[in-house]
């Protein structure tokens, strides 16, 4: 994948072609030429390009979030290193288990949740996790955004995770 630099992205103008000139001394922001072309075509709908320091701060914050999730989720294996995708899978399963437990306590005498789909155990998803991790690595212009919904509901509902894929 060819990578475009910040000044090449800004100087490319209104054309939507994927070709952008670069010099050897320009700073690389990690954006593919395709995503730069998409942002030129999209106009002002997309946010301005971040400088290198802002990108580093965002990456540091995300790594801190993953570390915190590793501490909070008791189902993560402690004897080996786990990928970010596997951390997210364990978080989803753990939140779902908590929701099922809350629902079963509120519905005295019944078990299960309100029609929540049955999820396969993690051991059967290892192949899918590996494939997804390869896909995420190959699509560097996409991010997964985690959003906690407790504030929107006034804290009355357990938190859940929403996943959105956005192009930068």
Curated annotation (Swiss-Prot):
Biological process terms in GO annotation: apoptotic process; BMP signaling pathway; circadian rhythm; collagen metabolic process; endothelial cell apoptotic process; endothelial cell morphogenesis; heart development; lung morphogenesis
Cellular localization per UniProt: Cytoplasm; Nucleus
Entry-linked CDD domains: bHLH_dnHLH_ID1 (cd19691)
Domain of life: Eukaryota
GO molecular function terms attached to this record: protein dimerization activity; transcription regulator inhibitor activity
Posttranslational modification: Polyubiquitinated; which is favored by Ifi204 and leads to proteasomal degradation.
Stored InterPro entries: bHLH_dom, DNA-bd_prot-inh, HLH_DNA-bd_sf
GO cellular component, one term: nucleoplasm
Protein known as: DNA-binding protein inhibitor ID-1
Record text on subunit structure and interactions: Heterodimer with other HLH proteins. Interacts with CLOCK and BMAL1. Interacts with COPS5, IFI204, GATA4 and NKX2-5.
